[in-house]
UniProtKB/Swiss-Prot annotation:
Keyword Cell wall biogenesis/degradation part of the UniProt annotation: yes
NCBIfam families: murB (TIGR00179), PRK00046.1 (NF000755)
Associated pathway: Cell wall biogenesis; peptidoglycan biosynthesis
Role summary: Cell wall formation.
GO CC term, one of those recorded: cytosol
Name listed for the protein in its UniProt record: UDP-N-acetylenolpyruvoylglucosamine reductase
Residues annotated as transmembrane: none
UniProt cross-references to InterPro entries, sorted A to Z: FAD-bd_PCMH, FAD-bd_PCMH-like_sf, FAD-bd_PCMH_sub1, FAD-bd_PCMH_sub2, MurB, MurB_C, MurB_C_sf, Oxid_FAD_bind_N
Location within or outside the cell: Cytoplasm
GO MF, one annotated term: FAD binding
Active site: R163, S232 (proton donor), E327
Cofactor(s) required for function per UniProt: FAD
Length: 347
């Protein structure tokens, strides 16, 4: 392993904002991870494990060690009824989805082009167009930072929720995802009830769904390689049936979907209807085609993004009485932070 000192983080996160890390190292094996996390030499140093850095914003320089997960490898087994994959945590997610489609393995096509690594998918319980990671998860393996051993959780033990999992709670800063196990029924059925997939026929092929999802994402979402961003910046808020009924009276065209504990309202619709598409502070801008995405127009600072996010949150609350929660992770000087904490520090 080679440790970089004073490393520029711009190439390591998709927002592409200039920030520095005191140390940065690329981990290519579980032994690398054990050496970094479990040895006395680096035990006291704050650490942040990242994959593609596709769902985070460094709010300032990071004083600890950034560990880049580059564990690679895909193992494929099958029986009469199922395909089973064991995927190393550093595998690129869009490439994994593409590989599955090429192999005729259905189940991930709705999750095409979501940036990031396989190891990040269970942490966020990534989802799109009616499918979430939990729907295809068999197990998740992780390095336990307390014991230095690799452990396995079943899908049920991962406690998946909307953009949520055990890795954000009981196992927060106690685990590094090393691999995921995925399970796909050979009797594949397309999930095409959402958005632009609705007009696909029920007998469509895996490739048809994949192509439609890719085309939609490329049309609506900016390529981080061209214009820095972290994808969907805010979560879709879940409100009670009563609150939704009141909202629907004033806004009959509100975009929403049933949720387990109420109604999930489209955050992009709320931001758009608040007149914020194209709204800009410094080099940070609400994307003109997809209001849920904040982009770096080229010279944005973290301060620009934070100020814009806070402004969006306040304006949406003023319009609808709904408080948006950011989906993007905010990384502070030595630990994870959030928008409320940042705003209180500015006061």
């Amino acid at each position: 392993m080679q440790i970089q000192l004073g490393a520029n983080l711009k190439p390591y996160h998709t927002f592409g904002i200039e920030q520095l890390a005191a140390q940065l190292v690329v981990a290519e094996s579980i032994d690398d991870l054990k050496a970094l996390y479990c040895s006395a030499e680096w035990a006291s140093l704050p650490k942040l494990i990242i994959g593609k850095g596709s769902n985070m914003l460094f709010t300032c320089h990071y004083t600890g060690m950034v560990v880049v997960n580059r564990l690679n490898g895909i193992e494929h087994q099958q029986d009469d009824d199922y395909h089973r994959l064991h995927v190393a945590g550093g595998e690129d997610w869009p490439s994994l989805v593409s590989w599955c489609v090429e192999q005729g393995i259905g189940g991930l096509e709705n999750l095409a082009l979501i940036p990031g690594c396989a190891g990040s998918a269970p942490i966020q319980n990534i989802g799109a167009y009616g499918v979430e990671f939990k729907d295809v998860c068999d197990y998740v393996e992780y390095l336990c930072l307390e014991t230095g051993t690799v452990k396995r959780l079943t899908m049920e033990e991962c406690q998946f929720g909307y953009r949520d999992s055990i890795f954000k709670h009981q196992l927060y800063q106690k685990a590094v995802v090393t691999a995921v196990g995925l399970k796909f029924a050979k009797a594949w059925q397309p999930i095409i009830q959402y958005g632009p997939l609705k007009d696909l026929s029920s007998d469509c092929a895996i490739h048809d769904v994949y192509q439609r999802v890719c085309a939609t994402r490329m049309e609506k979402l900016p390529d981080p390689a061209v214009m820095g961003n972290a994808g969907s910046f805010f979560k879709n808020p879940v409100i009670s049936q009563q609150a939704f009924a009141r909202l629907q009276i004033e806004h009959p065209d509100v975009v929403a979907y049933p949720a387990e504990q109420g109604v999930k309202v489209a955050a992009g619709w709320l931001i758009d209807q608040a007149g914020l598409k194209g709204h800009q502070i410094g080099g940070a801008k609400v994307h003109p085609k997809q209001a849920l995405v904040i982009v770096n127009t080229g010279d944005a600072s973290a301060q620009d993004v934070l100020m814009l996010a806070a402004d969006i949150q306040q304006r949406v609350f003023n319009c609808y009485g709904i408080e948006l929660e950011h989906e993007v992770r905010f990384i502070g000087e030595s630990e994870e932070t959030n928008l409320k904490q940042w705003m209180s520090e500015q006061a």
